[in-house]
Amino acid sequence: MKNLLTIASLWLLSLSLAAGQDASKTSSLEDQIKKLEQNWAQATVKEGAAAVDQYEADDIIATDPSGRVTNKTQDKLDLSSGDFKIQSEELSDVRVRIYSNTAVASGTNIVKGTYKGQDINGKYRFTDTWVKRNGKWQVVASQYTKVQE
């Protein structure tokens, strides 16, 4: 009986240690995705179309606040043509959920910029889906909604 209690205690201890490691790993991945979100926003302002190649997957599906669905090629064209001009992006309240090699990030973005000459300044809510492929995190889906204030 004493051996059974010892074995059960060791088993429970190993489970709690494993759970702690999983929580630590998840927290680290959440921080990594938050950093990628910040980097993507900054790169879009500084690098324009070059940021698309770095952060967007080839098969991305993106929906803008008007409901227009775009892909990587269209996003690059919008930025390189000057149709989409971003002066600043300020992310806040970014929350991340990890699902194995997939992460979902949601937050707020204060944008200053124009699209085809129209002012798009404002507060937006976003949801981005990141997938880790070949050791690299990239966005496969992105959706922005303008917050009505």
State what each model feature region is.
Residues 7-16:
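Bacterial N-terminal signal peptides
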